A protein has these predicted regions:
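A short, charged, and often flexible helix/loop element on the N-terminal side
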Residues: 7-43, 86-87
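Conserved donor-binding/catalytic core segment of Leloir-type glycosyltransferases
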Residues: 159-175, 181-185, 194
Length: 224
C-alpha cells in the first residue's frame, strides 16, 4: 500500500496540506508548516519517500520520528538554482539547508538521470556514492501516448503546414525561456513560435517574459 501526502489543493488519492501557516510568513517557512503537518499525518508505514526540498523536511522528520528509512529523489538541486533567492529571499537559505540536511540524512538518494547523480555527488561531497542510485522518470503509456488528432492544435491557431518551435513549461530562469523569446526574433518568418508557458516564479520574471513576448509579437507574425 502507498499513502500519498502532498501540498496544495485537495486531490483524489492524496492527503493535501495547505502552505498557509504561519500566515504571512516567508514562503519557505509556510512550506515548512506544511511539512510539519505532513510528518504528523503519515500513518504507520515501512518507508518514507520525499521529492524535492518542498517535501524533504517532512520525509526527514517522519523518518526520525518513526525510526524508518527515508529515501529522497533528486529532480533538481538548490545549489544549482541561486536565482530562487529572487522568489524566496532569505527562504532560499532555508530551502538549501533543508535539501542538504535531508540528503545527508537519507538512507538512499534517487537521481532521475546519470547527470543528476553526478551533480548530486558534486554538490554534496560527503554523500556515500553507493547510496546514490539512478532511476529514470517513468511515464504511464496508457495515459500519455501520441494523439493523431489535430483539433486542439488547429484550435490554438497553429498552421500544421508550417514549422514550429514549441516551449512547454513553467516560467522560471532555470528553463531559459527569455533566451528563446529573444532568439526567436532571428527565426525565419514562416516559423511559428508556440509558447505554452505559465506559473511564473515571480512577478518580475512574469513581466520580463511578458514584455519580451509583446516585443516579439510586434515585430513578426506566427507567435502564439
Amino acid at each position: 500500500d502507498v499513502d500519498v501526502q502532498c501540498m496544495g489543493e485537495p486531490r483524489e488519492g492524496a492527503t493535501a496540506h495547505a502552505e498557509n501557516y504561519p500566515e504571512g510568513a516567508n514562503a519557505a517557512l509556510r512550506v515548512f508548516g506544511a511539512d510539519l503537518s505532513m510528518a504528523a499525518a503519515i500513518p504507520k508505514v515501512d518507508l518514507v519517500h520525499s521529492h524535492t526540498w518542498y517535501a524533504n523536511l517532512a520525509g526527514h522528520l517522519a523518518g526520525l520520528l518513526n525510526d524508518i528509512p527515508h529515501v529522497v529523489t533528486a529532480h533538481s538541486l538548490e545549489p544549482h538554482r541561486p536565482w530562487k533567492a529572487e522568489q524566496l529571499g532569505g527562504g532560499y537559505r532555508l530551502s538549501s539547508w533543508t535539501e542538504k540536511t535531508a540528503f545527508q540524512g537519507a538512507d538512499a538518494v534517487i537521481a532521475v538521470s546519470a547527470g543528476m547523480r553526478k551533480d548530486t555527488l558534486d554538490s554534496y561531497t560527503n554523500l556515500d556514492p553507493d547510496k546514490v542510485h539512478v532511476v529514470k522518470n517513468g511515464i504511464d503509456t496508457e495515459e500519455f501516448k501520441p494523439d493523431p488528432g489535430t483539433d486542439v492544435v488547429t484550435g490554438l491557431g497553429i498552421d500544421l503546414d508550417k514549422p514550429s518551435v514549441v516551449f512547454v513549461g513553467r516560467i522560471t530562469r532555470q528553463k531559459g525561456l527569455i533566451h528563446l523569446v529573444r532568439a526567436a526574433e532571428k527565426f525565419d518568418s514562416e516559423t511559428q513560435v508556440v509558447l505554452l508557458a505559465g506559473a511564473p516564479d515571480t512577478p518580475e520574471i512574469a513581466k520580463q517574459i511578458g514584455d519580451a513576448f509583446a516585443h516579439l509579437q510586434s515585430g513578426r507574425g506566427n507567435v502564439l
